[in-house]
């Protein structure tokens, strides 16, 4: 899992949290600031909105909107300039008890540049611009190769994009005999070699930046004859890109139609590639658990300890894992409690804990954060790999049901 993948996973969790929140009136503020936008203009807009909000008829809604705007303006003062990818703020009263005020703020620096500027005060938060980032799927490189032409493309989700089309000067076959035929064949071979070099150079220029960003999940090469095998086996692609080739497919067409045929013919390869990789990881984890090799562990406490001592090779987290870490503290006597629970359990816990169990004070502070996000950050700091395990496979379901969706393959026994 690359840093970009981890950021998208964290973003998904935050969006899920934001979408659950409902305001009692139109009092939840969503603010999107694109990369490079002047923050002083945003502050000016918020001051104008603050002035307008003073005319809201409902006393409660007016109080909540003004409180949210004040909190947003205070937070923006922390920035000298807009973060590199822009900034999204979500602010509002999240208290479920009428008459109570609990103004919360979420500040999200997205993993990809924001290109929208938006201010909205509504009953729900506006998350669509961020959700759009989640809809961008892994990218697969596509190359179709023939003697005389080649096409380079990209598959993102269901969208096939033609990035480059090349043609060659490779001459056709000749009927000449003797030395002329051999000389002509050498010319054809040299022209073919030069053409393949050119294809490789263009592919390297397109795919290497995607590989560096962790977006390139594989490359599929297709063509009607043996030319595609010659291209794959030769030293035309960058060595790191050659490692990403996951399939070589026979196709009949070229150009955009060729890319579409390539994707259609390679549908099993594309589908099985991620599934096989995931199965392999889970099966390796299961093997260590069953054989009791000491090189696998599971459960939050055990995984957390393994991360703390740098023992984790690969952290496995199910996409269904939804635990949160909760810290409750009494501001009067100092009593403190730290627990891990589900979101549903947290809602019950929050309603029940109205007084300090030690001194009876109602002056309590309750903090909550996502366990998966915390463990991913710990893994990154420890140099461990992170893999999100889907619920789409039998192995993924087994990992979630039997181990709670959290485990680790270890570097050494602990």
Curated annotation (Swiss-Prot):
It is found in: Cytoplasm. The keyword Zinc does not apply. GO terms for cellular component: cytoplasm. GO terms for molecular function: translation release factor activity, codon specific. It comes from the Archaea. Its main location: cytoplasm. The keyword Cytoplasm applies. It holds the Pfam family eRF1_3. Keywords: Cytoplasm, Protein biosynthesis. Belongs to the eukaryotic release factor 1 family. Directs the termination of nascent peptide synthesis (translation) in response to the termination codons UAA, UAG and UGA. Heterodimer of two subunits, one of which binds GTP. This is Peptide chain release factor subunit 1. The gene is prf1.
């Amino acid at each position: 899992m690359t840093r970009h993948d981890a950021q998208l996973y964290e973003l998904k969790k935050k969006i899920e949290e934001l979408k659950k929140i409902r305001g009692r009136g139109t009092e939840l503020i969503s603010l999107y600031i694109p990369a490079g936008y002047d923050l002083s203009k945003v502050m000016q807009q918020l001051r104008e909105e603050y002035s307008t909000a003073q005319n809201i008829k409902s006393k409660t809604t007016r109080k909540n909107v003004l409180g949210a705007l004040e909190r947003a303006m205070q937070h923006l003062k922390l920035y000298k300039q807009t973060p590199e990818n822009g900034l999204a703020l979500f602010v509002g009263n999240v208290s479920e008890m009428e008459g109570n005020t609990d103004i919360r703020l979420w500040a999200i620096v997205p993993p990809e540049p924001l290109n929208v500027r938006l201010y909205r005060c509504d009953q729900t938060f506006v998350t669509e611009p961020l959700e759009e980032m989640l809809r961008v799927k892994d990218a697969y490189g596509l190359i179709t190769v023939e003697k005389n032409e080649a096409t380079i493309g990209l598959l993102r989700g269901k969208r096939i994009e033609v990035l480059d089309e090349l043609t060659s000067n490779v001459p056709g076959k000749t009927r000449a005999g003797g030395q002329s035929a051999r000389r002509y064949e050498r010319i054809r071979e040299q022209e073919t070699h030069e053409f393949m070099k050119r294809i490789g150079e263009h592919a390297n220029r397109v795919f290497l930046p995607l590989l560096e960003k962790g977006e390139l999940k594989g490359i599929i090469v297709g063509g009607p004859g043996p030319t595609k095998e010659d291209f794959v086996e030769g030293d035309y692609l960058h060595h790191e890109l050659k490692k990403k080739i996951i399939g070589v497919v026979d196709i009949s067409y070229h150009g955009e139609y060729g890319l579409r045929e390539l994707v259609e013919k390679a549908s099993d390869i594309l589908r099985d590639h991620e599934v096989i990789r995931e199965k392999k990881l889970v099966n390796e984890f299961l093997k260590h658990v069953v054989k009791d090799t000491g090189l696998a562990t599971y459960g939050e406490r055990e995984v957390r300890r393994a991360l703390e001592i740098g023992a984790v090779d690969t952290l496995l987290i199910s996409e269904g894992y939804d635990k949160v870490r909760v810290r409750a503290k009494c501001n009067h006597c100092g009593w403190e409690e730290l627990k891990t629970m589900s979101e549903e359990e947290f809602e019950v816990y929050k309603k029940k804990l109205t007084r300090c169990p030690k001194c009876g004070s109602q002056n309590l502070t309750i903090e909550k954060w996502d366990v998966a996000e915390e463990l991913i950050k710990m893994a990154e700091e420890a140099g461990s790999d992170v893999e999100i395990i889907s619920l789409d496979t039998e192995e993924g379901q087994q990992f979630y049901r039997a181990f709670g969706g959290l485990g680790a393959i270890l570097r050494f026994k602990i």
